[in-house]
């Protein structure tokens, strides 16, 4: 930001330039501030919504004193505060004058698209008063014109849906490379119930049960003897190969749709032998996929 401090800027106590990042997210109502905030949270930012501009200095001071706790701080500010928003320009100038480093992301969209979004939600515009939605939009655009001119980044969301905006924010503010898909790969026993949060459920009870082999009964699918028994079965390795191949295009679609988490549940009768061995192999294979992290869990192993 390069706004010169005005003569009547609010007084702020000097603070050390923070090592934390401070991003101010603002712009037109209906342009996607909430979606942008959610995307930033997914990227690891700490997001504060609807903060009165006058409190920015206090929050920036806190971030500068605890950068380990708040390394990336995003603040969403809009015109819902109405009278409080009138001091926005002066507040930003005072922040800069006091040594606080920050950047501003301004979201906007065409009048026609904003009207259609409000009509779809059946909600009034915050500046509409007794007039039309378009009256509120035009009043807000006039109120924000100076802030838009000084923003570091202006993002036009006219042609965006939720997923496109999420991807755009990720492209702009991800500091760790491409967004990673986080997978939980879990074994379970059907007799204890299917995991409620599973996106995919596989049934490996087609494999002969090691439970009926006395030497294998006390062991688990993590033991080499059980694993060898399971994968000696015709179709076990083919199942893993095809299951993993089926998941790969699904994960590509998840990234396109900005879905960052998925749970894969693989079950047998008790969740001790077959599902554990198969889950271990599926997790090993999936962990080699690009832009994927795998959390391996055996929900029911040891439960019997």
From Swiss-Prot:
It comes from the Bacteria. InterPro entries: P-loop_NTPase, RapZ-like, RapZ-like_N, RapZ_C. GO terms for molecular function: ATP binding; GTP binding. GTP binds at residues 78-81. Gene3D superfamilies: P-loop containing nucleotide triphosphate hydrolases. Keywords: ATP-binding, GTP-binding, Nucleotide-binding. The keyword Nucleotide-binding applies. SUPFAM superfamilies: P-loop containing nucleoside triphosphate hydrolases (SSF52540). ATP binds at residues 27-34. Displays ATPase and GTPase activities. Belongs to the RapZ-like family. PANTHER family: RNASE ADAPTER PROTEIN RAPZ. This is Nucleotide-binding protein KRH_12070.
């Amino acid at each position: 930001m390069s706004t010169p401090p005005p003569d009547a800027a609010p007084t702020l106590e000097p603070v050390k330039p923070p090592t934390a990042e401070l991003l101010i997210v603002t712009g037109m109502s209906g342009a996607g501030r909430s979606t942008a905030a959610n995307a930033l949270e997914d990227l690891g930012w700490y997001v504060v919504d609807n903060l009165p501009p006058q409190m920015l200095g206090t929050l920036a001071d806190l971030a500068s004193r605890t950068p380990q706790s708040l390394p990336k701080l995003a603040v969403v500010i809009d015109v819902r505060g109405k009278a409080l928003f009138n001091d926005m320009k002066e507040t930003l100038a005072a922040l800069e004058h006091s040594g606080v480093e920050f950047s501003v992301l301004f979201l906007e969209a065409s009048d026609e698209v904003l009207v259609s979004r409000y009509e779809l939600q059946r909600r009034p515009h915050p500046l509409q008063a007794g007039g039309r939605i378009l009256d509120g939009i035009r009043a807000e655009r006039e109120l924000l014109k100076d802030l838009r001119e000084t923003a570091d980044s202006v993002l036009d969301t006219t042609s965006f849906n939720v997923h496109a905006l999420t991807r755009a924010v990720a492209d702009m503010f991800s500091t760790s490379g491409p967004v990673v898909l986080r997978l939980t790969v879990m074994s379970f026993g059907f007799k204890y119930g299917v995991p409620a949060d599973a996106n995919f459920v596989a049934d490996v009870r087609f494999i002969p049960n090691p439970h009926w082999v006395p030497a294998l009964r006390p062991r688990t699918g993590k033991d080499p003897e059980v694993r060898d028994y399971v994968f000696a079965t015709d179709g076990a390795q083919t199942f893993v190969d095809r299951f993993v191949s089926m998941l790969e295009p699904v994960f590509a679609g998840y990234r396109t749709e900005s879905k960052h988490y998925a749970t894969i549940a693989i079950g047998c009768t008790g969740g001790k032998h077959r599902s554990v061995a198969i889950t271990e192999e599926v997790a090993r294979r999936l962990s080699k996929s690009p832009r994927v992290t795998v959390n391996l869990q055996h929900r029911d192993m040891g439960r019997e």
